[in-house]
């Protein structure tokens, strides 16, 4: 970079935009700034960065944060509450994601008259409904990922995008109909569009969460995690939630390799759909 003591907003296919110049390097002259907005195909998404060495202030009436990250050090999120507002001020889209792991959820079309008998498909449907729907509307900034690991041909992953999905209603049967239709489509490792806002692939847990970690800050919801009331949440959070049985030890190890934070919503073990509602409630109050 032209000035190693400056923080920049970096956009794909766009010139560098200097925010401000630091008077002194925060992590030494040999380290480059790591404060960047990356712009994937559609939405500008914030890359997690090191929040322990940063400044906050005002420039042209806007809140800004600055920081540098040693090249050898893993990126972490900033603990600055101004980041979501900063991100929106420069045209970014702060999004939310939910990954629901269904260890026994069927991976072939199933009967809509027996959702619990389809590997507790009812749990995944309720989580999807609570993640996407509000009164008389849908959350356009939410993506739901369903990982189905039941018989007969696991794994299968289903993606539902709030800003694209059509003709979906909050009831379990309707959501299940969209999932059933997705399972009837032949697919490979790449996402294949089923219809508006619904995609399917054969990604397993590690492939899926590695892909999601490029776009989201992964948060694993677990009773023994950091209390949500004391936690500083990263931008673009994606919450990983187990089904009625939770995650296996092996799955937990995979998730924890990519997780920025292990978060507790309650000391009690909650229903999966309750976790979705509480996470939304907390982010709504923070105006994420």
From Swiss-Prot:
One of its GO terms (biological process) is tRNA methylation. Gene3D superfamilies: 3.40.1280.10. Residues 1-94 are annotated as: Unknown. InterPro entries: Alpha/beta_knot_MTases, TrmY, tRNA_m1G_MTases_N. Keywords: Cytoplasm, Methyltransferase, S-adenosyl-L-methionine, Transferase, tRNA processing. It holds the Pfam family Methyltrn_RNA_2. SUPFAM superfamilies: alpha/beta knot (SSF75217). Its EC number is 2.1.1.257. The keyword NADP does not apply. Residues 95-288 are annotated as: Methyltransferase. GO terms for molecular function: S-adenosylmethionine-dependent methyltransferase activity; tRNA methyltransferase activity. The keyword Secreted does not apply. Homodimer. This is tRNA (pseudouridine(54)-N(1))-methyltransferase. It comes from Archaeoglobus fulgidus (strain ATCC 49558 / DSM 4304 / JCM 9628 / NBRC 100126 / VC-16). The lineage of its organism: Archaea, Methanobacteriati, Methanobacteriota, Archaeoglobi, Archaeoglobales.
């Amino acid at each position: 970079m032209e000035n190693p003591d400056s923080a920049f907003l970096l956009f794909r296919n766009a010139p560098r935009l200097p925010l401000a110049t630091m008077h002194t390097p925060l992590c030494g002259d040999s380290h480059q700034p790591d404060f960047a907005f990356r712009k994937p195909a559609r939405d500008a998404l914030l890359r997690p960065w090191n929040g322990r060495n940063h400044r906050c202030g005002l420039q042209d009436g806007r809140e800004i944060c600055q920081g540098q990250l040693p090249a050898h050090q893993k990126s972490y999120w900033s603990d600055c509450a101004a980041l979501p507002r900063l991100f929106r001020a420069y045209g970014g889209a702060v999004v939310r994601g939910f990954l629901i792991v269904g260890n026994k959820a069927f991976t072939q079309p199933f009967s809509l008259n027996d959702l619990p008998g389809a590997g507790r498909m009812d749990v995944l449907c309720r989580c999807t409904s609570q993640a996407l729907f509000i009164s008389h509307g849908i959350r356009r900034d939410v993506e739901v990922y369903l990982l189905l690991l039941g018989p007969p041909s696991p794994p299968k992953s289903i993606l539902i995008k709030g800003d694209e999905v059509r003709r979906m209603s909050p009831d379990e049967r309707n959501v299940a109909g969209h999932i059933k239709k997705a399972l009837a489509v032949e697919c490979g490792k790449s996402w294949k569009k089923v219809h508006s806002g619904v995609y399917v692939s054969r990604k397993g847990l590690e492939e899926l969460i590695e892909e999601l970690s490029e776009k989201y800050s992964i948060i694993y919801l677990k009773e023994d995690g950091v209390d949500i009331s004391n936690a500083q949440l990263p931008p673009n959070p994606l919450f990983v939630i187990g089904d009625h049985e939770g995650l296996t030890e092996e799955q937990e190890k995979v998730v924890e390799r990519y997780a920025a934070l292990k978060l507790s919503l309650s000391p009690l073990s909650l229903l999966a759909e309750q976790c979705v509602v509480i996470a939304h409630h907390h982010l709504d109050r923070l105006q994420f």
